[in-house]
Amino acid sequence: MIGWLKGEKIDHWNNGNRAGFVLSCNGVGYEIQLSRRNLIALNNYNVLSIWIHQVLKEDGSNLFGFIEKSERDLFRKLITVSGVGPQLAMSLLDDNSYEQLIANVQNKEVTKLTRSSGVGKRTAERLILELQNKLSDFDLNNEFSPPTKLRPESAEDLNEELLTEIKSALRNLDYSDFEILEAVNTVTSNYLDDAASANERKLLLKSLNFEKLFKQALITLNK
């Protein structure tokens, strides 16, 4: 089983809401699926080391990649839950940071968990029931090695309802979640270029409305 790879990123791939890259290691190209958060964080990196979870199938295998071993461990814990497969686990890691996901399970945040694609109320309740007391060993101070993040500030700084509305509107135009989040990241980064302080950045993010963010995200997507 493959557990870790180090090599050069040579290509990207995107198939609906699934995306990743091809990593060249000793003359072999490995196609690896990653969460959008990790893909955006690794955007400016070419030589990478990635923790791998391999899923064997009759017609081959799928490789799921993670920047940190602790996130891979969390992924493996998620797929032990009844009804939660690798793609649903990736969806949860797409829409929640490592720390947020652990906190949402431990704090019984059913509504927040159901914001992830494919996660209904019953699935969220099963996650809480089966994992609530099994995540105490996970490090809540975990930080990814790359300095870049999905958004310039914490997730709470950009209104979650606004982000949900933007995602819904752009999905209706056939953009993938990966493309949408990448565009939002670009727009917010540009919007904050002239901010002088952390407080000013937070205020600027909170001042973004649907019309402004949607228009700029659409411009970015059509470049």
UniProtKB/Swiss-Prot annotation:
GO terms for molecular function: ATP binding; four-way junction DNA binding; four-way junction helicase activity. GO terms for cellular component: cytoplasm; Holliday junction resolvase complex. Residues 147-157 are annotated as: Flexible linker. Residues 158-223 are annotated as: Domain III. GO terms for biological process: DNA recombination; DNA repair. Residues 1-67 are annotated as: Domain I. InterPro entries: DNA_helicase_Holl-junc_RuvA_I (IPR013849), NA-bd_OB-fold (IPR012340), RuvA (IPR000085), RuvA_2-like (IPR010994). Homotetramer. Forms an RuvA(8)-RuvB(12)-Holliday junction (HJ) complex. HJ DNA is sandwiched between 2 RuvA tetramers; dsDNA enters through RuvA and exits via RuvB. An RuvB hexamer assembles on each DNA strand where it exits the tetramer. Each RuvB hexamer is contacted by two RuvA subunits (via domain III) on 2 adjacent RuvB subunits; this complex drives branch migration. In the full resolvosome a probable DNA-RuvA(4)-RuvB(12)-RuvC(2) complex forms which resolves the HJ. Has three domains with a flexible linker between the domains II and III and assumes an 'L' shape. Domain III is highly mobile and contacts RuvB. Belongs to the RuvA family. The RuvA-RuvB-RuvC complex processes Holliday junction (HJ) DNA during genetic recombination and DNA repair, while the RuvA-RuvB complex plays an important role in the rescue of blocked DNA replication forks via replication fork reversal (RFR). RuvA specifically binds to HJ cruciform DNA, conferring on it an open structure. The RuvB hexamer acts as an ATP-dependent pump, pulling dsDNA into and through the RuvAB complex. HJ branch migration allows RuvC to scan DNA until it finds its consensus sequence, where it cleaves and resolves the cruciform DNA. This is Holliday junction branch migration complex subunit RuvA. It comes from Prochlorococcus marinus (strain MIT 9211).
